[in-house]
Amino acid sequence: MSEKIRVLLYYKYVSIENAQEYAAKHLEFCKSIGLKGRILIADEGINGTVSGDYETTQKYMDWVHSDERFADLWFKIDEENQQAFRKMFVRYKKEIVHLGLEDNNFDSDINPLETTGKYLNPKQFKEALLDEDTVVLDTRNDYEYDLGHFRGAIRPDIRNFRELPQWVRDNKDKFMEKRVVVYCTGGVRCEKFSGWMVREGFKDVGQLHGGIATYGKDPEVQGELWDGAMYVFDDRISVPINHVNPTVISKDYFDGTPCERYVNCANPFCNKQIFASEENETKYVRGCSPECRAHERNRYVQENGLSRQEWAERLEAIGESLPEFVGA
């Protein structure tokens, strides 16, 4: 029986001097112990998801906690059967969360250590979900929401998080005077975004402390009132949250049946994320449109070594054809 893999999700807003040098040092240590994952280090803090066996992840947590700046850093731990990452990346960036403010001036950015929304534990957040007078706002990207979200949460008409501040400004009159509660995967985006809402003049702003990941592990709420699965930015793609009455809300792109399996369109110039069963991925060569299915650089065709004849037969089976110049 193979050893369990632990996946660590964490962040901390804290001032890091010489952050670029620290990022290089951090990467060196991670590689020395065989850790895999993706970490962002900025002047304002650290944000990461890493994976490894018990011994490796314990070494990493002990090393991080030995630094007084991160002595109280909160690691959220998942147990999995396989690695969530294939390589180790540690990158320096100006910010660990970019709000996309129109002036793009880092000096005007929000410091969550000074301004942030009120923390709500899972029980308090569940109560907020059931309160008709509370607005619950999902702060994640559109494709994250489509896989799973809290029941009754507002889905902003945006494609990604950077568009959220402008959307809120455009819709301010709808909930300016109401209690607003925000949530995200692990909490890092909400720390900054809820602070921005406070600065914008919203009177009562709360945030799910520890994010969806913590809500799903809470022994009392057990993820109840969450529909679907939670999107994660690693090889797992999704993880279960609701352990009371789980549901599947996302639908297969091709036939509309319940499906939580995300894939990227095989056309590298499209790369659209779609839900697709393995059967439909095979049937439609992972292309989201006739053009993508017949694209000369279709990655599904390349990855599976399909001959031109096999490719053409797949398309003919669904009433499409392969142009003569493609794959010739």
Swiss-Prot record:
Keyword field: Oxidoreductase, tRNA processing
Reaction it catalyzes: uridine(34) in tRNA + AH2 + O2 = 5-hydroxyuridine(34) in tRNA + A + H2O
GO biological process: tRNA modification
This protein's record includes keyword rRNA-binding: no
Family statement drawn from the similarity comment of this UniProt entry: Belongs to the TrhO family.
Function comment: Catalyzes oxygen-dependent 5-hydroxyuridine (ho5U) modification at position 34 in tRNAs.
The keyword Oxidoreductase is assigned to this record: yes
TM region(s), chain numbering: none
Gene from which the chain derives: trhO
Gene3D superfamilies per UniProt: 3.30.70.100, Rhodanese-like domain
Rhodanese domain mapped to chain residues: 130-224
A GO MF term: oxidoreductase activity, acting on paired donors, with incorporation or reduction of molecular oxygen
Protein name per Swiss-Prot or TrEMBL: tRNA uridine(34) hydroxylase
SUPFAM superfamilies in the record: Rhodanese/Cell cycle control phosphatase
Superkingdom in the source lineage: Bacteria
UniProt-listed InterPro entries: Rhodanese-like_dom, Rhodanese-like_dom_sf, Rhodanese_C, TrhO, TRHO_N
SMART domains: RHOD (SM00450)
First-tier enzyme category under EC: oxidoreductase
Active site positions: 184 (cysteine persulfide intermediate)
Enzyme Commission number: 1.14.-.-
Pfam families: Rhodanese, Rhodanese_C, UPF0176_N
CDD domains (alphabetical): RHOD_YceA
Organism: Streptococcus pyogenes serotype M6 (strain ATCC BAA-946 / MGAS10394)
